[in-house]
């Protein structure tokens, strides 16, 4: 896949996105067609975006062609879990040096691919371009093609060097690599009328494992997972699914749209967070598959699960009802978590709109109401001031804001991809309620908000001094 300016513009002007110029004309978000601006990669560059989209393919090797820091500084940042192979957790890099920059790194890359195949025998090798290797002009496509012919294993180039744009653009390039080199290259053993693909679900903290059993109960088969806990082979025959389900992510929208164009697979966009969204997701999948019996089974399952969930959540709702939180995260989580919080009786008084589409912002306005605050961006000082002004009880944000909250003695819950607890599906709601309860009612808050013992002693002494000057000297002598 040659990464030309035309290709970049094509992905930036995604026709399935409401920001596209054909849909909005003059109102189009200008960032869709602009060159990457300085700072656009803050919080994740295009290389990082492509990598975190594809690394969850657990039986493949992922080789970063560039300086060692490109792999080392970003490896393992997304907590995707595997139910089997662990090869995806091993970081491979060509460790480009100054000599390689001068003389080229193509031979080094070729040898690295052969060595990985010899020692680990992966199902496939994904090779990621970085800024350095793109700037010196290494022909990664040609090297991958030659190596694949030599070892008889697919070698997929992922040309998304960091300087071309943001993490979201890199996600789309990852999807393009799958479309160009993987999807449609194999056939499944059999198909059913109930085969679906999950796109944009990365199995963070094992979240997908709380949803798959529900689909199995309904007789729905997940043919391919793109890409959480995925095997390379299943992505090869993803083109035989009857429906693509986009989960809480528009970053791989290009993949869903092109699979509809190329293979006639319709797609829907859903969320696994919150009771209402989970119910809606199951209903919409059943409706799209078009089987009345499946729809009846879905309603029965929803009734059973929500009844059991209400019993499990009752003690948490009693303690969480009326609590106020500030939500500071990005993308679809800025509205999907609001829905989950409302199910627990929690009031979200403010949320961020970073990386949110216009559709996301409309959902936020509807969920928050007229009094809700929408933050475009904010630093630590502004966040703490917002918590104070809104009298919020808690900050829900990503790990980078953890110490901001803890230093201010504010309860905190990590909601981003680094977390270790699954919040999706019905079982995820129970886990989220438990985490919120434990964070809010931890005994540590009462302890750390008390004055220090020496401050208490001095306060007592000051009071005694002002009330009875004659006794203060004796008190000081006793303490000394």
Swiss-Prot record:
Keywords, comma-separated and alphabetical: Nitrogen fixation
PROSITE patterns documented for this protein: NITROGENASE_1_1, NITROGENASE_1_2
GO biological process: nitrogen fixation; protein-containing complex assembly
Ranges for region Disordered: 12-35
Coiled coil: none
Pathway stated in the Swiss-Prot or TrEMBL entry: Cofactor biosynthesis; Fe-Mo cofactor biosynthesis
Molecular function in Gene Ontology: nitrogenase activity
Keyword Nuclease carried by entry: no
Record's function text: This protein may play a role in the biosynthesis of the prosthetic group of nitrogenase (FeMo cofactor).
Family statement drawn from the similarity comment of this UniProt entry: Belongs to the NifD/NifK/NifE/NifN family.
Protein name (Swiss-Prot/TrEMBL): Nitrogenase iron-molybdenum cofactor biosynthesis protein NifE
Species classification: Bacteria, Bacillati, Cyanobacteriota, Cyanophyceae, Nostocales
């Amino acid at each position: 896949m040659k990464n030309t300016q035309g290709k970049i513009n094509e992905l930036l002007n995604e026709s399935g996105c409401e920001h596209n110029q054909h849909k909005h004309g003059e109102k189009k978000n200008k960032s869709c067609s602009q060159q990457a601006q300085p700072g656009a990669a803050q919080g994740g560059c295009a290389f990082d975006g492509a990598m975190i989209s594809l690394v969850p393919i657990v039986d493949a090797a992922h080789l970063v062609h560039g300086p060692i820091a490109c792999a080392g500084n970003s490896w393992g940042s997304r907590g995707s879990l595997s139910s089997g192979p662990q090869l995806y957790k091993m970081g491979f890099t060509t460790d480009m040096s100054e000599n390689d920059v001068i003389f080229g790194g193509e031979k080094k890359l070729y040898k690295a691919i052969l060595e990985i195949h010899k020692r680990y025998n992966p199902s496939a090798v994904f090779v990621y371009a970085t800024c350095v290797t793109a700037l010196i002009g290494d022909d990664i496509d040609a090297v991958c093609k030659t190596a694949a012919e030599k070892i008889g294993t697919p070698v997929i180039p992922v040309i998304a060097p960091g300087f071309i744009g943001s993490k979201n653009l890199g996600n789309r390039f990852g999807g393009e690599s799958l479309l160009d080199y993987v999807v449609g290259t194999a056939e499944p053993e059999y198909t059913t009328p109930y085969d679906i693909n999950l796109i944009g679900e990365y199995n963070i903290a094992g979240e997908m494992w709380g949803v798959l059993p529900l689909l199995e109960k309904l007789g729905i088969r997940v043919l391919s997972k793109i890409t959480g806990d995925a095997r390379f082979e299943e992505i090869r025959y993803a083109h035989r699914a009857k429906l693509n389900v986009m989960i809480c992510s528009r970053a791989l929208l290009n993949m869903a749209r092109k699979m509809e164009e190329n293979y006639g697979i319709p797609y829907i966009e859903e969320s696994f967070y919150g009771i209402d969204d989970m119910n809606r997701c199951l209903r919409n999948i059943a409706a799209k598959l078009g089987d009345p019996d499946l729809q009846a089974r879905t309603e029965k399952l929803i009734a059973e699960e929500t009844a059991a969930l209400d019993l499990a959540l009752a003690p948490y709702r009693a303690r969480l009802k009326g609590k106020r939180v500030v939500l500071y995260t990005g993308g679809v989580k800025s509205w999907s978590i609001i829905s989950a919080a409302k199910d627990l009786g929690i009031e979200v008084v403010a949320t961020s709109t970073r990386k949110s589409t216009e559709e996301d912002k409309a959902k936020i306005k509807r969920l928050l109401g007229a009094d809700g605050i929408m933050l475009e961006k904010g630093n630590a000082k502004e966040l703490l001031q917002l918590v104070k002004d809104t009298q919020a009880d808690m900050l829900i944000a990503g790990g980078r804001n953890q110490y901001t909250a803890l230093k201010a003695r504010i309860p905190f819950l990590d909601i981003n991809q680094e977390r270790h607890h699954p919040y999706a599906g019905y079982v995820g709601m129970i886990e989220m309620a438990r985490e919120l309860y434990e964070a809010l009612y931890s005994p540590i808050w009462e302890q750390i908000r008390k004055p220090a013992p020496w401050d208490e002693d001095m306060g007592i002494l000051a009071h005694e001094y002002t009330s009875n000057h004659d006794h203060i000297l004796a008190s000081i002598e006793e303490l000394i």
